[in-house]
Amino acid sequence: MSSSIHGINFDNQTVTAKDHGHLFQSVIVDGIMSGCELSFSGTSLVITPGYLLIGGREMKLTANTTVIVSGATTGYARVLITIDLTKAATAELFEQADFQIQYSNTATGFSALNQEQINGTGTGYQFALCTLAMGTSGIASI
């Protein structure tokens, strides 16, 4: 007798990234799980090592990461972590997540985040890590 029930986290069954992500996304909101403290100097935003959960996908920063935010001297910048599942992911190379910067004259003037169902058929997902106030010397505040 065949069954439409398929085990996921059972012995001798395969757990895919989508299966794993689906579980996390249904019970935990996007965000920093630990570490990932933010500081700034001039146009440099520094993020310390830590763990994040974005779109149900767990990722980690293994070293201090510097994001240069130099596209504006007034207004605001929003720092995104963008997931793109069409990019490479191998045991040696991971290119499916990166930082992106958006700029706006107002703190609420940013476009809507792209949050496709990446644990289904979608391939793109954005998470707003922080919003920065910009000044003539670079980042004025987080």
Predicted regions and their residues:
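N-terminal "first-domain core" detector
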Residues: 1-52
